[in-house]
Amino acid sequence: MDTASALDLIRANHRAVLATTRADGTTQMSPVTAGVDDEDRVVISTRETAYKVRHLRALPYAALCAFPDRFFGDWVQVEGPVEIVSLPEAMEPLVEYYRRISGEHPDWAEYRAVMERDRRVLLRLTVERAGPTVHG
């Protein structure tokens, strides 16, 4: 599967599982809501204190499997390096992340306050590999 097709699937299907690597080399997986930004990076909102962020600070590479709400159907796995954007730089990208996935928020001031309170960060995954290329 080419990167453009993989990103199109993620734009339409936001449910995903993110896989990061623990210090001992084992895999840690987290359910996430994924979107795609203007630079064709997969974007995910999470808390600064989440284990996935700790793992990505140590090894900034991840894999993500995205699938439809009904679970069965077309799915995609993408992999690549991850950038962590912390507040305050993350605020406007977090607003754009929300807009792309959910549309307009009824109270952007409240949204921004929650992002601050929760110490939200934005993960940006640059796709280097996408699949599957065959179905078994």
Walk through the language-model features, giving the residues of each.
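Alpha-helix boundary recognition
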Residues: 10-11, 57-58, 116
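Generic structural signal for secondary-structure transition and capping sites
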Residues: 14-15, 61, 106, 130
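Short gly/pro-enriched beta-turn/loop segments at secondary-structure junctions
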Residues: 11-13, 29, 118-120
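Extreme N-terminal tail/first-helix region
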Residues: 1-16
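Short secondary-structure boundary segments
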Residues: 67-69, 127
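Charged, gly/pro-rich active-site loop segments
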Residues: 74-136
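Short beta-strand segments
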Residues: 14-48, 56, 62-66, 75-77
